[in-house]
Amino acid sequence: SDSMWYREKGFGKHDWLYCMLLNFGGNVGLHGRMNQLVNGYYDACAHVNGKRMRGVGATPEGIENNPVMFELLYELPWRAERFSPDVWLQGYLKARYGGELSPEVMEAWRALEHTVYNAPKNSPGEGTLESLLCARPGFHLDRTSTWGYSKLFYSPDSTSKAADLMLSVAEQYKGNNNFEYDLVDIVRQSNADKGNALLDEISQSYDRKDKENFRKQTQQFLELILSQDSLLSTRKEFSVSSWLTAARSLGNTDAEKKLYEWNASALITVWGDSIASNQGGLHDYSHREWSGLLKDLYYLRWKT
C-alpha cells in the first residue's frame, strides 16, 4: 500500500524514518519490492514531507531472511542520487560471493529480481507468499496462515530456473558460505512453489474423482515435504533444532529452559492456547519452512 509519509501532512512536526516492513511472523520465503523500496525512498526525500526524515529503518517481525533486501535498504542513505537496483545487484553479489561472478549466478539472480523481488504493490496477504507444505491439510488452499497468501504472482518456472542455474555452478563456489546459504534458500523456494502448484493439481484430481492421479500426486506431495526437510537440514539457519537450542540456552535453570523451549515451540506452531490458535486464527501464523518441522509436524499432518 502507499507509504504513510505520503499522507497530506505526513507525520506533522515529528521526525521520522523511512522503514521497510518485509516480513510477518518470521515466515520463510524469498520476497521483496526492490524497485519500490528504492524509488519510494528518493520520492520521500524530494517530497515536502521528507524534510523531517532522519534516516532508514527495518521493522520486520522476522529478520533472518532475504539478506539482499536489508542490504539494499541500508544502502539508501549512503547514495545521494537515485540508482537502479538492477545495477546495484551486480555489485552486491560480487561483494557477497567475492571475486568475479559467473554468468549463471547473475542470470539466476536476474530471474529472482524480476519475480519474487518485484512483488506487486497491493498484493494480498502479509509478507512472503506462503508455502502450502506448511499448511493444515485441505483442498483449494490459498494460504497457510489466516492473514497470509500463497497464490503465485509469477511463474514457478522462474524460481526453478534460478535454482537450476545456481546448482549448475555449485561446485565452483563450494565452501563459499554465502553462496551455499543462497543456494539452499533458492532451491527451497523452487520446491515450495512446486508444492503449491502440485496441491492445486491434487485438488482438481479430487474434484474429478480421479483416484489414480490423486494417489500419485499426494505421494509426490509427501515426498516433496521430506525432500525439503532433507535439503534444509544442511543449514543451521533452516533448522528447528537451532531455534529450540537457542531458546533453551537463555534459561538459567531446568525449569526456565523447559519454559523457553515450550514458548519457542508454541510460537512457530499454535502461537498460544487453543482459543488464540483456532478461534483467534493464530495457528501457523509464525510457521517456518524448517528442517525438523517439515518432517515431524507438517509431513505427519498431511500424511494423516
What are these regions (language model features)?
Residues R301-T304:
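Short, intrinsically disordered, charge-balanced linker/junction segments flanking boundaries
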Residues S1-S102, M106-E113, N118, N122, ...:
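Catalytic-core regions of glycoside hydrolase
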Residues A170-L183, L231-A246:
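Short, solvent-exposed, charged loop/turn and helix-capping segments
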Residues Y149-K174, F179, V184-D207:
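C-terminal substrate/ligand-recognition segments
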